């Protein structure tokens, strides 16, 4: 990633290079580009996707897979965006710590069994053996000022540490 950030290589070209090495890694989703053009790539899918304007969601599968937590996150983010004149990182972190449990009949069947599907069902996962460890919010305002906040959690969403960075995008 550092190579991409320090270079002038277009996002689509960089992702083609990543694609050539992607079998060396566990499953991942990668979103990169500029504020005007974003791309998504996963080594679980068939290729690179240029993202259209709007709200997209990704979990541990392909982008916009209609899992209940992905659909709920997209709906809640849309609600926040349409109800707030000034958006703060905390507005989005409140969405990301949602522990709503989908009913069993709405859970995906990813091959891990019902007990694990229940554990993995909420946006914010808490279990003694597996859970959400961090969430990131990136806001870019109309003046190209960026607020980047990564929140690292202990075992519960109420206990966390934020790393926050502010910078200005340049051409």
Report each predicted region and the residues it spans:
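N-terminal nucleophile
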Residues: 1-171
